[in-house]
């Protein structure tokens, strides 16, 4: 019986431990690079944007790369 276990122990190696991510603290984070402020969204701004006919969505479309979830044709 020990020969049987010996055969398998030679073929199966130890599994490598998954690498742990380093914990990030504040000293590792720098200033934002290439940051462009496009709009401010506060707690009341989102509701006001929908009431004004989607002006917020129009602003975002003008920035490029914006694909709304519902097409304008469906509205």
UniProtKB/Swiss-Prot annotation:
Record-linked InterPro entries:
CRIB_dom, CRIB_dom_sf, SPEC
A GO BP term here is: regulation of signal transduction
One cellular component term (GO) for this entry is: cytoskeleton
In the UniProt record, the signal sequence range is none
Subcellular localization = Cytoplasm, Cytoskeleton; Cell membrane
Primary role: Probably involved in the organization of the actin cytoskeleton by acting downstream of CDC42, inducing actin filament assembly.
This protein's UniProt keywords:
Cell membrane, Cell shape, Cytoplasm, Cytoskeleton, Lipoprotein, Membrane, Palmitate
- This chain's protein is named CDC42 small effector protein 2-B
Main location as per UniProt: cytoplasm
> Where does lipidation (S-palmitoyl cysteine) occur on this chain?
10-11
Gene3D superfamilies, from UniProt?
CRIB domain
The molecular function terms of the Gene Ontology recorded here are: small GTPase binding
What is this entry's stated membrane topology? Lipid-anchor
Q: Which Pfam families match?
A: PBD (PF00786)
Q: Which PANTHER family match?
A: CDC42 SMALL EFFECTOR PROTEIN HOMOLOG, CRIB DOMAIN-CONTAINING PROTEIN
UniProt domain CRIB: residue ranges = 29-42
- Annotated S-S bridges: none
- Recorded superkingdom: Eukaryota
Which family, according to the similarity comment?
Belongs to the CDC42SE/SPEC family.
